[in-house]
Amino acid sequence: MPYTYGTPEWEEAYNKRLQERIANEPKPFIIFLPEWLKEWEKYLQNDAKYKELALPNWENAIVIHITPAPQFGLDHDIFVRMDLWHNGECRSIRYIPKSEVGKNPKDFIITASIDRWFAVGRKQLDVVKGMMQGKLKLKGDLPTVVKAVKPAVRIVETVGEVGGKYEDELTPEETEKFRATVNELLPEFGLV
């Protein structure tokens, strides 16, 4: 039986599984898996440059919506919520279920295929230009995002600094392991 998102049981089970994966999975972690998201969260929480650039009154989350890409082992949509707050505080970066997406009208939802997210992470696609060109679909107030260009660019820069292995760099065996991991975690934690 899957855990119910937002409950203490969910939180406890998710954190336990996350700690097991951090301890047991080989590094570099695969980008967008929970253990990598935790590394990214910690990095952003301690990044002085991001804190310096962040807007003092920012109270918005950014939801990264990654659409399915079976060729990379991704059979389901994944939603990653970056809970960002005043002066560069990063409260968390983690998976959320689709049912939670858009509940807060201040949240920004950016949707793209995983290969577009690879391009963003590798600095081959500027996140703001990508939104303006329709390569990344934004749901939210574009003028507010445009005001936050510098912190947004810094967030993208941190992806490369955290490091990790992109799904298009995986061997066929690693791709199948990635697929199995996602196909196990999402239903178990009520994320599909």
Per-range role (PLM):
Residues 1-192:
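Feature captures hydrophobic
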